Amino acid sequence: MSTSRTTTNNKRHTKHVFVTGGVVSSLGKGLTAASLGQLLIARGLNVTMQKLDPYLNVDPGTMNPFEHGEVFVTEDGAETDLDLGHYERFLNRNLTANANVTTGKVYSTVIARERRGGYLGRTVQVIPHITDEIKARILAMGDPDEHGVVPDVVISEVGGTVGDIESQPFLEAARQVRQEIGRENCFFIHCSLVPYLATSGELKTKPTQHSVAELRSIGILPDALVLRCDREVPEALKTKIALMCDVDTDGVVSCPDSESIYTIPETLYHEHLDTFLIRRLDLPFRDVDWTGWRDLLDRVHHPEREITVGIVGKYVDLPDAYLSVVEAIRAAGYAHRTRTRITWITSDDCTTPAGAATALGGVDALVIPGGFGARGIEGKIAAVTYAREHRIPLLGLCLGLQCVVIEAARQAGLEQATSTEFDPGAAQPVISTMAEQQAAVSGQADLGGTMRLGSYPATLEQGSLVAQLYGITEVSERHRHRYEVNNAYRTQIGQRSPLIFSGTSPDGHLVEFVEYDRAVHPFLVATQAHPEYKSRPTQAHPLFSGLVAAALAAAVTDA
């Protein structure tokens, strides 16, 4: 039974844990924070998480995927950092817009307040006004949730690297939080690189020492260090680092590279990071309940079968652009005790029949994920054609649904079928701009934060494949799009092609799901939504699970 507090029993302070990074970026702070959160939940605590992003963008919604990676959409429609996807998957809970704080959001709020006269004529400065706004957003994560439950622990990851000029207001705010709520209610974890020099055969501790010195110079004394390395850090080196960085030996944790990100909680558990933190913060706890996670790790490390899943996309040079899609595919594989090997396929390589045959010939299943713009679109449509003709299981997501509809429309005699996104003057726009998106598309309104975002309900056709996969006919999925199936062409496409419009918005206006009759194709399903955002490693999403099951069934048939 959870020891979480409610608003009627609020005697114990919410504890705040801050995770910072040093030496280099991309150390895995987000995964470390999420893994610690999972561990604390396994000990019966209520945990929520937050990402503090130093960039000046209000959110990543308008950022190039090559710049930022995936944009993760929350239930309430916030476009956030991809680390929130890790948080949701590891904690198995939905987060909100409040879980992602950017410099852009903070400055926008402070400047708007100044314009309204909220500072009563005072000079607005980084300290205290910007830091106060950051602190308010951090402390607000400790408020009761919609069920009246107050979290036991809030874990806040500070993006960037200690020493970055952009991170300074966030680190100063974190320092002030510790001062305000009491040191007994606050815990700092610093992730640092311990590089291995092959020429000398040594692990070097000096970068970590310098990084901690930089952190201490701004008033933050780390309580624990997570040492990132490509191998185990010996106890002697951990003792040396503890001495030189003035950290308890029990608080120096080795976290080497691992085959699967889902083994990180187990690594931190064996290093006793959770027990050290619980002891320091005087948290109530129980023995770790590993039941669900151990079953997951057994499936991760002991697959019984293997399939290859191709992802046909525009941004495949940066796999992080499709991070949640990859994790959803892997989770579906775990559910079926199957290793899923991911093959990255550039959509431009599939434009011709010969190119599609070369690029797609060795895959057992295909996923066509979301994206924007005309580049590579004909390759995605050609990939749909190849999958349809060769009966390869295919799942289309967002833009993937639109490609499936365009391909079916061309089968139905609409040879010029396309989307107004790719050709605003299209003669046969089977995909068109949503009415409420016209202003943004025409440049008369902001692009950022104006798409159809967040969770929306859909009604599935009784007896359809998607209804069978979900097990229900009323579902809810997250969205991020401006374009929709043009209802003027629905009847013609439905009558002249095997495509079935198997799910719509409750009012029947928006097409949300399409599929092919199973007599025509074993598994060709697409959704306007982004179901990958709701997948969990311990609970595969039904659509991805269905894709993997179809690929396994096809492999048995072929054998």
Swiss-Prot record:
Region (Amidoligase domain): 1-283
Keyword set includes Isomerase: no
Binding locations of ATP: S26, L27, G28, K29, G30, L31, D83
Positions bound to UTP: S25, K204, T205, K206, P207, T208, Q209, K240
Annotated Glutamine amidotransferase type-1 domain residues: 308-557
Active site (record annotation): C398, H530, E532
Pathway membership: Pyrimidine metabolism; CTP biosynthesis via de novo pathway; CTP from UDP: step 2/2
Keywords: ATP-binding, Glutamine amidotransferase, Ligase, Magnesium, Metal-binding, Nucleotide-binding, Pyrimidine biosynthesis
Descriptive protein name: CTP synthase
